């Protein structure tokens, strides 16, 4: 039966030394989503490896994590979660945050983009910004082997926001993070191989 709304997934394991992105690049224009990650060692992958071999972002394709649910903190730096019912933690609480924030209205600017308006003070801790006119969802991920304390480096001019009226909060996300509020200049603790979802907004 013809199903016009059906999605085509491309699934693969690591491909050993070949890597699935190298092996299947020719198929990318014809699929909707990548489901790479069987046997991926997410906690050992460097940021560039995440970006090129897993995320699909350089090729304009979305992705989902697989092996053991991936790393749900670092995955958010690439706007990806595990597939529902694969892994210990449900991605639904993060999806709910996406929905309440209105992520479909945001422009994604990752650490790999020279115009990303949010950076961190530590090169091992990456930030991706999902930018709306009145608020920004920030995903921060610590790729290092140790806990880090970082502060955010924010390009207020490119955001068109008044720093004196800005608020920085970590919303509660079930099984992901507790609610917190940070001052704009304070150091934010990020555990090794984990991260935070933050919302930068203007006080009303």
Segments predicted by a language model, with ranges:
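C-terminal beta-strand-rich structural cap/linker in extracellular carbohydrate-active enzymes
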Residues: 179-204
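Active-site-proximal substrate-binding groove within the catalytic cores of carbohydrate-active enzymes
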Residues: 1-162, 170, 194
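Solvent-exposed beta-strand/loop surfaces of large extracellular or lumenal domains
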Residues: 165-186
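Polar low-complexity intrinsically disordered regions
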Residues: 163-167, 203-204
């Amino acid at each position: 039966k013809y199903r016009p709304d059906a999605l085509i997934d491309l699934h693969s394991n690591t491909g050993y030394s070949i890597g699935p992105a190298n092996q299947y690049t020719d198929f990318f224009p014809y699929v909707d989503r990548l489901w790479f990650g069987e046997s991926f060692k997410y906690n050992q992958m460097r940021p560039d490896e995440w970006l090129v071999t897993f995320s699909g972002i350089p090729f304009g394709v979305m992705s989902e994590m697989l092996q053991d649910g991936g790393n749900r903190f670092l995955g958010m730096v690439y706007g990806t979660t595990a597939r529902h019912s694969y892994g210990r933690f449900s991605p639904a609480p993060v999806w709910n945050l996406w929905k309440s924030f209105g992520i479909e209205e945001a422009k994604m600017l990752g650490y790999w983009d020279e115009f990303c308006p949010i950076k961190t003070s530590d090169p091992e801790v990456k930030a991706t910004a999902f930018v709306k006119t009145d608020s920004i969802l920030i995903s921060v991920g610590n790729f290092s082997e140790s806990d880090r304390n970082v502060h955010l480096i924010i390009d207020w001019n490119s955001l068109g926001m008044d720093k004196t009226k800005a608020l920085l909060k970590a919303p509660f996300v079930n099984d992901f993070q507790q609610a917190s509020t940070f001052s704009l200049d304070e150091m934010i603790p990020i555990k090794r191989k984990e991260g935070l979802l933050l919302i930068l907004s203007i006080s009303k």
